[in-house]
Amino acid sequence: MIPFTAQYLLVCGYVILLGVILLERSGYSAFGLLEKRQDYFHNSHAIMLSSRQDLGVSGPALYELFEKHLLDAYRIPGRYPGGISTLYDTFSEYVFKGTSHENCSVETSAVAKLTRDVTPLPIHSHNDYWRDVPLLKGLAYGSVSTEADVWVHPHKDHPYNSSTDKLEDYVLAVGHDEDYIDPLRKTLEKLYTDPLQSLLEGVNCGKSNNSKTQKNGVFYTANHIPLFFYIDFKSDDNILTYKLLLEKYFTQLIQAGYLTYYDMDTGKIIQGQVTVIMTGNYPNNTDVLDNGKADGYFGDRKRYLLQDANLLELNEESAKMAVTASTSLSEILKMVGSSNLKVIMRGHLDKEEITAIKKYIDNAHSFDLKTRIWGVPSWPRKTMKRLWKQQIEDLNSDFLNVDDLKAAAMF
């Protein structure tokens, strides 16, 4: 028989446990350490997002602060109806809150909030659109290169006919697989071009397209460094994709003078704050690129969408309209008589492989192109980091193709 004192303590324990469960279900934090969860989030959210409020951290520290401390926010339904996610919406709202082109200051800009303490790194944010916070997370970790896979999708239900429809009838949805795209919420405009426009406007107060003053880029401490933006053409109709990019999605960035372009008169690449690079199923016929005109798509003797050349088939002609050259590790190893399996089993590139691969890298550099090797194994982690080091130190490649931003930033 249980003594009375033990029975009393047991009953008290059950009562306390029941109380904790009821508090959790009603939204209150266990043991009353925090106020009601939803109110706590809303109140702290309101404090963080008050006009021009600055949390005092930027870069990875800022992103990780939101990522860790918004865990309970996922339990709050409908915080941002129609938004991307609670994390994305809250983070981007903080970054852009209180910033505008009309009343802007570099010190209080979105760029300052996001990248004030960030050192730009030779990192390409691979499959960036898969990240919880596309574009902004990569910038916070110092990635100087990002990418978006785009699919043509009709605005509404009607037969697909690019010859009769208007451009406004279509959107470019962002995603790796067409079956999983979200053409309402996850478009190129919402995830990339609009945020880029806002970032750049906030640090280029009063600078017009015709201004001779050098415009600032997206990195606060290195405003001369451009962002490389790969657009991977996924849809079969690459001509419609190309037209949408120029006439809808990049129009404002072009008009503001932010895009890198190819000068048809001098044959040179003129650097801007954002360098847009076509990859995948993109058109390369000059009639398409220039819209059938002798003086360029917009009649200004400029081409704004540049190309990613094949690193393994590079020549003077293919390099002319390119700014980068890329290939996969498996393809370049095949060209030099090796394979991914051999490298993984060994844990690194050997001297013969390095010598043979470096010839391709050096060839690209002779055309003033930056290089990227994708498809580098991400496991074992030791092998991944060894290959990162060899790409930088031995091959002198320009961009590391990275999935794990935190690991690369700490590398």
UniProtKB/Swiss-Prot annotation:
Superkingdom per UniProt: Eukaryota
SUPFAM superfamilies xrefs: PLC-like phosphodiesterases (SSF51695)
Signal peptide (from-to): 1-29
UniProt entry keywords in alphabetical sequence: Signal
Molecular function terms from GO: phosphoric diester hydrolase activity
Gene Ontology annotations of biological process type: lipid metabolic process
Similarity section: Belongs to the AIM6 family.
Cited PANTHER family: ALTERED INHERITANCE OF MITOCHONDRIA PROTEIN 6
Protein name: Altered inheritance of mitochondria protein 6
Organism placement in taxonomy: Eukaryota, Fungi, Dikarya, Ascomycota, Saccharomycotina
